[in-house]
């Protein structure tokens, strides 16, 4: 199945899945599952991938070589997102410590007492036993594979490597 993913189809698939993932995160946030510092940072890859994959999808017909190069970039970005999601999931499972920005302390004085700090080491929600950070790792890894498959596609619409 992945061998049929030309650059345009791969880019479009990434656009759709990345958009759905980010919209899902916003819906969970609106439902009261406030994101932690690491959760918000993980969204950065999606903020990049959504417009970039749309641009690649639109331009792939006229510039397949450029689209393939762009998909390699997306593969690296989403691989980084998968690693970051796995790191965050590890923090939630207490396998390792998270950054200091993920816990509340009063060392900053009174103004910080009004600021809500969501702990990064507590999963706000688990779906089928996997936290949202874990799902981000899985989805990002799948998107990295899709991007790589699209970049490596050797069809009639692609330029040979």
What are the language-model segments listed below?
Residues 117-161:
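A hydrophobic membrane-anchoring alpha-helix module
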Residues 27-37, 160:
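Membrane-interface helix-loop junction between the first two transmembrane segments
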């Amino acid at each position: 199945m992945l061998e049929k993913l030309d650059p345009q189809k791969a880019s479009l698939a990434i656009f759709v899945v990345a958009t759905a993932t980010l919209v899902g995160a916003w819906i969970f946030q609106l439902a009261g599952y406030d994101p932690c510092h690491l959760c918000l940072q993980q969204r950065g890859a999606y903020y990049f991938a959504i417009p970039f994959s749309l641009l690649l999808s639109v331009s792939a017909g006229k510039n397949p070589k450029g689209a393939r190069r762009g998909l390699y970039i997306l593969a690296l970005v989403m691989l980084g997102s998968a690693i970051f999601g796995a790191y965050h999931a590890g923090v939630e499972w207490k396998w390792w410590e998270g950054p200091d920005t993920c816990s509340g302390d009063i060392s900053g004085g009174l103004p910080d007492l009004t600021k809500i700090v969501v702990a990064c080491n507590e999963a706000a929600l688990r779906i089928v036993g996997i936290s949202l950070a874990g799902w981000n790792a899985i989805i990002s890894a799948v998107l990295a594979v899709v991007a790589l498959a699209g970049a490596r596609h050797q069809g009639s619409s692609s330029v040979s490597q």
